From Swiss-Prot:
PROSITE patterns reported for this sequence: ASP_GLU_RACEMASE_1 (PS00923)
Catalytic reaction(s) noted: L-glutamate = D-glutamate
Record keyword Nucleus present: no
Protein's recorded name: Glutamate racemase
Residues reported to bind substrate: D7, S8, Y39, G40, N71, T72, T183, H184
EC number of this enzyme: 5.1.1.3
Alphabetized GO MF terms: glutamate racemase activity
Protein's organism: Campylobacter concisus (strain 13826)
Function: Provides the (R)-glutamate required for cell wall biosynthesis.
Gene Ontology biological process terms, A to Z: cell wall organization; peptidoglycan biosynthetic process; regulation of cell shape
Keyword Isomerase: yes
Amino acid sequence: MRIGIFDSGLGGLSVLNEALSKLSEHEFLYYADVKNVPYGQKSRDEILKFSFDAVKFLVKNGAKAVVVACNTATSVAIKELRANLSVPIIGMEPAVKKAHDLSHDDALKTLVIATPVTVNGAKLKELIINLNAKDKTELLALPRLVNFAEKAEFESENVKSYLKEELVKFDLSKFDFLVLGCTHFNYFKDSLREILPPNVSIIDGNEGTIKRLISELGLKISSVNLTPNVKFFYSGEEVCEQNELEKISRNLARLEKMRAIC
């Protein structure tokens, strides 16, 4: 089966990496909207247009299902995409429910880091209210992380200083989970792990998203790991340049290392 994965940029490679670990016999189309990244500070109308352009492109190129591997696009566009397109559309959702289910100490909180659009959006707030977790959840927008990720600036002093400056706003000893509410943030798990107290676990929504994809399409987890069959597109143009393909390969290799950090 041909499956499309769409993100504003290269953050969604973390979702592709998760998909390849479980569904290696399937074909994937990965669409990175690099001309318009980042989405986190764009208007709602802009994000809707970009999302429809991307998903329609993937469907036109044979995708039988599409994963919107972008929390910001999911927050803004998922309802409209599902209402107007006939293929299954799987969205991202910050792993707040997972953190809520795993937490065994009512005195400790969950910190969700995401883009400004996701943090201020109704979808995340509705999720928190439905879980009755408003008093146990704090939100923090980290817009610069997306730009760092797109530049492949993962471990610089600029990144570490930025994270420390933002996270110092919270008494981290009062938290037990940090939820990555943006797929770009998976690149920074090592830097986050250095800053966070040992008792704070890092979780993301990638595994849950691919589980939903498998369930909705009735797929089976691959019994063997085959060579990935993936075509990459930058805002509708197939990526053929060797240097760009090598960059994507390096990013996937880094994300595979980051999967082990929690």
